[in-house]
């Protein structure tokens, strides 16, 4: 039980302190990558959706 509580606390701390990380700006040298960085968090969802499309293509065997 104690291990689960420790894990929850660690996750909460990470979520609280990393939230400011998501809103930081890229350095000027990498400013041209802003559009790519904005799309990157959505890429795993495309793979998730691709799994359903693939299963539909093979009739959910």
Curated annotation (Swiss-Prot):
Compartments, record wording: Plastid, Chloroplast thylakoid membrane
UniProtKB keywords: Chloroplast, Membrane, Photosynthesis, Photosystem II, Plastid, Reaction center, Thylakoid, Transmembrane, Transmembrane helix
GO biological process per UniProt: photosynthesis
InterPro entries tied to this protein: PSII_PsbK (IPR003687), PSII_PsbK_sf (IPR037270)
Annotated transmembrane regions: 40-60
GO cellular component, one term: photosystem II reaction center
Membrane topology: Single-pass membrane protein
Residue ranges the record assigns to the propeptide: 1-24
Role of this protein: One of the components of the core complex of photosystem II (PSII). PSII is a light-driven water:plastoquinone oxidoreductase that uses light energy to abstract electrons from H(2)O, generating O(2) and a proton gradient subsequently used for ATP formation. It consists of a core antenna complex that captures photons, and an electron transfer chain that converts photonic excitation into a charge separation.
Family: Belongs to the PsbK family.
PANTHER family, per database record: PHOTOSYSTEM II REACTION CENTER PROTEIN K, PTHR35325
HAMAP family: PSII_PsbK (MF_00441)
Assembly mode: PSII is composed of 1 copy each of membrane proteins PsbA, PsbB, PsbC, PsbD, PsbE, PsbF, PsbH, PsbI, PsbJ, PsbK, PsbL, PsbM, PsbT, PsbX, PsbY, PsbZ, Psb30/Ycf12, at least 3 peripheral proteins of the oxygen-evolving complex and a large number of cofactors. It forms dimeric complexes.
Protein name: Photosystem II reaction center protein K
Organism, as annotated: Populus alba
Gene designation per UniProt: psbK
């Amino acid at each position: 039980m104690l291990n689960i509580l420790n894990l929850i606390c660690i996750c909460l701390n990470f979520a609280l302190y990393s939230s400011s990380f998501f809103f930081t700006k890229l350095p000027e040298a990498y400013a041209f990558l802003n559009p790519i960085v904005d799309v990157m968090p959505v890429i795993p969802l495309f793979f998730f959706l691709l799994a359903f499309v693939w299963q539909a293509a093979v009739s959910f065997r």
